[in-house]
Regions:
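Bacterial N-terminal signal peptides
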Residues: 4-17
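Intrinsically disordered, low-complexity proline-rich regions
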Residues: 1-2, 270
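Noncatalytic, solvent-exposed loop/strand surfaces
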Residues: 18-370
Length: 370
């Protein structure tokens, strides 16, 4: 939420005559920026969408999420990073809960940067400073909590010196829910780079590696025959087996300040990830027994992504590259289909755009609000 107003997004979608659907986490039900199958956008709007309700929103970069007729917002309120549950029908506030003190730097507004999640009767959120909380959906009461810094040895110093990744600009990447696990890029020490918690109790299920956290959220997918969590950490791409955190593969990517923001995109046995400095990589993941190997099938600096996570539609990948250019490339071989100037945006080195796939169309919202 970048501006001062939060609108009922679920009802805005309804004004486009889309079937009702939950959007319970960052980038939607499948965490890939795609609306559920069967939803379509009209060729054009016959009338201006009607604003059903609006409420003031505090600073932050978190997205609201929707489930079961409820909207969960995460913004700065009264000097705290705060969760608020709203009624989707009328915007009425049902409860609010302070999560952590806010964080500010030169890269964005003072407020949370990671998107919360709704899962059944629980909600989950992580603050910029690494305070991870699980609360009851019904009343917002705290169920369990943990601190990336205090409990797991992660570093958080803010915008100081040359410290890279989430330790510098905050924990932006929302953890991923899978089965009974909540898996997070904690960035801790003593093997707590990636940590899987029991989502109901917060108890440790496994921890793995010593990677520092960057900004990209983890995703879960079956790649080369093994179900795994794929993280884009300050050290590069990383694959770990979901049940036990067993190491599978690694692809080193080192950049200044570890500005690794875009979420990994999965296409069969390919993992696509990249940054503004290293470029975009299409990694081929192969299997050798219980281990795997990652090798670049293709790479491109011509369409290096920065803050915006790309989306896949069929055999093509769409994203925002350098100089604010929208691009389309073939995911199989990395061949660029086209690139062109996109929506009105800010400075090229800080521009971002949110891309959502609805049927055969892409919705795009730029940092200029267009």
């Amino acid at each position: 939420m970048k501006g001062p107003i939060l609108m009922a997004l679920g009802l805005a979608w309804a004004s486009l005559q889309l079937p009702a659907a939950d959007w319970p986490q960052w980038r939607g039900p499948n965490r890939d920026g795609a609306a559920p199958a069967g939803q379509k956008l009209p060729a054009q709007l016959t009338e201006e969408p009607r604003v059903v309700w609006r409420i003031p929103a505090g600073p932050g970069l978190s997205s609201p999420v929707i489930a079961g007729g409820k909207v969960l917002a995460f913004d700065a309120q009264a000097g705290q990073e705060t969760l608020r549950l709203l009624d989707a029908a009328d915007g009425r506030e049902l409860w609010r809960a302070a999560v952590d003190q806010p964080f500010s730097d030169s890269q964005g507004p003072t407020g949370p940067r990671g998107t919360p999640m709704i899962d059944g009767d629980r909600v989950y959120a992580v603050s910029c400073r690494g305070e991870l909380q699980c609360r009851a959906l019904a009343d917002g009461k705290l169920v369990w909590r943990t601190s990336y810094v205090t409990n797991w040895g992660a570093t958080f110093v803010g915008e100081k010196g040359a410290i890279p990744g989430a330790a510098r600009h905050g924990n932006n990447g929302a953890p991923v829910l899978h089965g009974d696990l909540l898996i997070a890029n904690v960035g801790g020490t003593n093997g707590a780079g990636v940590v899987a918690f029991d989502k109901r109790t917060g108890e440790l299920r496994w921890k793995s590696q010593n990677d520092q956290a960057a900004y990209a959220p983890p995703v879960v997918a079956t790649v080369a025959g093994i179900e795994q969590v794929i993280s884009f950490t300050a050290d590069g791409g990383l694959g770990l087996a979901v049940p036990d955190g067993r190491f599978l593969w690694r692809f080193p990517i080192k950049t200044a300040f570890a500005r690794h923001v875009g979420a990994p995109v999965i296409f069969g046995d390919r993992v696509i990830l990249g940054s503004h400095q290293a470029g975009l990589f299409g990694l081929a993941i192969t299997r050798d027994g219980d281990r795997q190997e990652a090798q670049p099938a293709w790479s491109s600096k011509e369409v290096a992504i920065n803050f915006a996570s790309p989306v896949r539609v069929g055999q093509q990948l769409y994203g925002l590259g350098p100089a604010k250019d929208l691009f389309c490339l073939d995911v199989a071989d990395g061949k660029i289909r086209w690139k062109q100037p996109g929506l009105p945006m800010g400075a090229p080195d800080k521009a971002w755009v949110s891309l959502l796939v609805v049927g055969d169309k892409i919705l795009a919202l730029s940092d200029a609000g267009v």
